[in-house]
Swiss-Prot record:
Transmembrane regions listed in the UniProt entry: 9-29, 64-84, 88-108
Lineage: Eukaryota, Viridiplantae, Streptophyta, Embryophyta, Tracheophyta
Enzyme class: translocase
Record protein name field: NAD(P)H-quinone oxidoreductase subunit 3, chloroplastic
InterPro entries assigned: NAD(P)H_OxRDtase_bac/plastid (IPR023043), NADH_UbQ/plastoQ_OxRdtase_su3 (IPR000440), NDAH_ubi_oxred_su3_sf (IPR038430)
GO cellular component: chloroplast thylakoid membrane; NADH dehydrogenase complex; plastid
Species in which this protein is naturally found: Oryza sativa subsp. japonica
Bilayer topology: Multi-pass membrane protein
Length: 120
């Protein structure tokens, strides 16, 4: 007897969910006209001609702040479900979550000591 028959709906959903975007891209590639020209290669900026060059330098500090923000944002995403079911999970999951937070705090202290969080 096939034991995975309970997942038939899941596999059907997965196949249909995969086929819809593939078919949409395929049909649009089949029906859309392909026109090469200078207008396709020009940049578009709110309907007006762009002024100046498109290459702007920005400080790497913005990147570091964004990276630290993403790390702690992902931490929040992982810790929220744990906090909602804290009373059911027990002490072992609490220790795992504590180790997870401790690793992130060590990373934050490392970034702080390296000067990654200094603005000037």
């Amino acid at each position: 007897m096939f034991l995975l028959h309970e997942y038939d709906i899941f596999w059907a959903f997965l196949i249909i969910a995969s086929l819809i975007p593939i078919l949409a891209f395929w049909i649009s590639a089949l029906l859309a006209p392909v026109r090469e020209g200078p207008e396709k290669l020009s940049s578009y900026e709110s309907g007006i001609e762009p002024m100046g060059g498109a290459w702007l330098q920005f400080r790497i500090r913005y990147y570091m702040f964004a990276l630290v923000f993403v790390v702690f944002d992902v931490e929040t995403v992982f810790l929220y479900p744990w906090a909602m079911s804290f009373d059911v999970l027990g002490i072992s999951v609490f220790i795992e979550a504590f180790i997870f937070v401790l690793i992130l705090v060590v990373g934050l202290v490392y970034a702080w000591r390296k000067g990654a969080l200094e603005w000037s």
